[in-house]
Amino acid sequence: MTYSPTINTTITAQQTTTKGVALRTQGSSKNESSKRKSKKRVAKVAKDMYQIVTDRIIAALENGVKPWACPWDRTQQCDMLPMNFKTKAQYSGVNILLLWSEIVEKGYSSPYWLTYKQAAELGGNVIKGQKGTEIIFYKTWEKKNEQGEDEKIPMLRSFVVFNLDQIENIEKPVIAVKEDRPKNDEFEILPHVENAILATGAVINHVGVRAFYAPSQDTITMPTQDRFTSSSDYYATLWHELTHWTVHKSRLDRKLTGSFGTKDYAFEELVAELGAAFCCADSGVFGEIQHDSYIASWLNALNNDKKYIFKAASLASKAHQYLLPR
């Protein structure tokens, strides 16, 4: 199976305030020289943000930590992605990785986040001395090209959010731990996950001992459930293959042009691993796919392309949103 993804990025969850790392472009400049300088500064800052985020991902992987592993043991909430407490919007793309990593590093117990202004609007305040977490979004900047036509340029900006654990005077929601969830060593059919998978319309054949998506036939092959030691392993594997399944031209149309062992193949495997992690978190599955054999390839790509993780996480979020629409 060969993979060559399209490059795309998505806007992250809506926020009421931002602290941009890019310079403001509103207002008129006094001369063309100042405009050119402003553009250069914008580009430089955006480039730095890509590097800052990439460096965090590299450091985590080099320390044996996958930043896309949902921190179930911290939040006790394994059926949701990081979410803005005010808007109830899920964060997406690379922001999921940044916020999950922060939960693990700081030991936060809440999956909810707010900006400083949002906390104040809800009657709360950030506890003195607390440091926020910087996440990103894209803003479109319009300019005229050489033909005099409007051209839209995506500009990377950042803003700061705080975990609900860092905020006082806001009533925190009680997170109910579902005791009926199967443990890692138990196999139990999860009806809500089965229904979600059925709703995708994917053709899934249970036969043999390998799990794979066949693009030529547009079908998924899975071992029978009794071959898995736990339902978590089974559903995590199936979400992984379903993420591959979204490449089809009738769905998300990711281009497949490589073969096993190529950089493009490793990239698609990262997209599928991230997509499976997002779907597991959103559907209450504890499972995690182990693809450690690809880590060396991913690290090499991350060191050579600061936008690599942004592209993969964006495509994974698109797959997750396709498979589990809200």
What positions do the PLM features span?
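N-terminal accessory/interface modules of nucleic-acid-binding and processing proteins
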Residues: 2-326
